[in-house]
């Protein structure tokens, strides 16, 4: 079928300089929200106080995956926060620097599922990633950051996207970048916020595009997209966690590799999915086969994007595609 929304703006360059200091009024400079393609500066002054010498976390140094998952389950008790320590530099996992303790044995699915409250229906798509030594390294780094900084969303919401629909119920996949970095917003679904939180700018543009496609769609005024998730829309960020007040701060600890593996298995298992890829990040991170799936591309819904997102017809095109395959369309009301 023809893709009505394949136009994409020129790629944005991610700034290589350190994060800019926000104005005194606390407003991040040129930043709409945490899901926008160009990460902005933190508008929260707190950073972490690191215990000890800042070396490898105890779980990573001890008895391997079992101790690592036990440490994650125990949680960051007694962690304090101050504004004295500098932010962590990005971590690059491409150098193969995985500790021997982290690679001693595959991670156990049952424990992993219990720690993160993952729905067991996702086991065939996620368990193969646990055999990859880089996943142990990822979780060790996640655990270390939980001990030294405030990580969003809460651990019980990192994989909440697995609890709304099973892999066999997914009809549409919408790819985001990383969670919102202000407290009370992120809850594990890309672009979505909790029901008591006003929609951030990018999400407002998404909902406006829905209204343009379906004027009769009901909009409740909040930005919680759980209804979409229960209806078979997988709202998945390529990075599942973030440091409070620091957009893209966890973008290089390895979540993208983990999420990419899950998406590849889902795409192989479920031909005929609709993928909505908004912005160059999503389009470069996830590349489904357009001969097998309906792949829709458009600019990011950020107010900073060159192409206004309100003209995007993805929600209409997605339903038409599903109907051609005798699949029930999505009710995009919120």
Curated annotation (Swiss-Prot):
Belongs to the uracil-DNA glycosylase (UDG) superfamily. UNG family. It is an enzyme of class 3 (hydrolase). NCBIfam families: PRK05254.1-2 (NF003589), PRK05254.1-5 (NF003592), ung (TIGR00628). Changing residue 53 to L: In strain: Nonneuroinvasive mutant HF10. This is Uracil-DNA glycosylase. It comes from Human herpesvirus 1 (strain 17). PROSITE patterns: U_DNA_GLYCOSYLASE. One of its GO terms (cellular component) is host cell nucleus. CDD domains: UDG-F1-like. Residues 1-63, 79-104 are annotated as: Disordered. Excises uracil residues from the DNA which can arise as a result of misincorporation of dUMP residues by DNA polymerase or deamination of cytosines. Therefore may reduce deleterious uracil incorporation into the viral genome, particularly in terminally differentiated cells which lack DNA repair enzymes. GO terms for biological process: base-excision repair, AP site formation via deaminated base removal. Its EC number is 3.2.2.27. Changing residue 49 to N: In strain: Nonneuroinvasive mutant HF10. Residues 40-50 have a biased composition (Polar residues). Keywords: DNA damage, DNA repair, Host nucleus, Hydrolase. Pfam families: UDG. Changing residue 38 to I: In strain: Nonneuroinvasive mutant HF10. It catalyses: Hydrolyzes single-stranded DNA or mismatched double-stranded DNA and polynucleotides, releasing free uracil. The lineage of its organism: Viruses, Duplodnaviria, Heunggongvirae, Peploviricota, Herviviricetes. GO terms for molecular function: uracil DNA N-glycosylase activity. Gene3D superfamilies: Uracil-DNA glycosylase-like domain. The active site is at residue 178. It is found in: Host nucleus. The keyword Hydrolase applies. Residues 1-17 have a biased composition (Basic residues).
């Amino acid at each position: 079928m023809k893709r009505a929304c394949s136009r994409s703006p020129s790629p944005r360059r991610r700034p290589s300089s350190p994060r800019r200091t926000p104005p005194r009024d606390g407003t991040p400079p040129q930043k709409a929200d945490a899901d926008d393609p160009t990460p902005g500066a933190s508008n929260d002054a707190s950073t972490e106080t690191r215990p000890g010498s800042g070396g490898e976390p105890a779980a990573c140094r001890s008895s391997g995956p079992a101790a690592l998952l036990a440490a994650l389950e125990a949680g960051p008790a007694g962690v304090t926060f101050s504004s004295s320590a500098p932010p962590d530099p990005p971590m690059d996992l491409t150098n193969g620097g995985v500790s021997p303790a982290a690679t001693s044995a595959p991670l156990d699915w049952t424990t992993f599922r219990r720690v993160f409250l993952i729905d067991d229906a996702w086991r065939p798509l996620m368990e193969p990633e646990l055999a990859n030594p880089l996943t142990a390294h990822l979780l060790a780094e996640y655990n270390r950051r939980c001990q030294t900084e405030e990580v969003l969303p809460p651990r019980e919401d990192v994989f909440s996207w697995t609890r709304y629909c099973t892999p066999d119920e997914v009809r549409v996949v919408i790819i985001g970048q990383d969670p919102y970095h202000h407290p009370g917003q992120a809850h594990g679904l890309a672009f979505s916020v909790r029901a008591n939180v006003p929609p951030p700018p990018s999400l407002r543009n998404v909902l406006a595009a829905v209204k343009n496609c379906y004027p009769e769609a009901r909009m409740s005024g909040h930005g919680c997209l759980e209804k979409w998730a229960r209806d078979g829309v997988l709202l998945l960020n390529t990075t599942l966690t973030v440091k409070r007040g620091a957009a893209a701060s966890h973008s290089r600890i390895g979540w993208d590799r983990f999420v990419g593996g899950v998406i590849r298995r889902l795409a192989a298992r479920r031909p005929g999915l609709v993928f909505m890829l908004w912005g160059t990040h999503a389009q470069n991170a996830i590349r489904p086969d357009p001969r097998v799936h309906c792949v829709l591309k458009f600019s990011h819904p950020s107010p900073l994007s060159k192409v206004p997102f309100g003209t995007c017809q993805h929600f209409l095109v997605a339903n038409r595609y599903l109907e051609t395959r005798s699949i029930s369309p999505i009710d995009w009301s919120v």
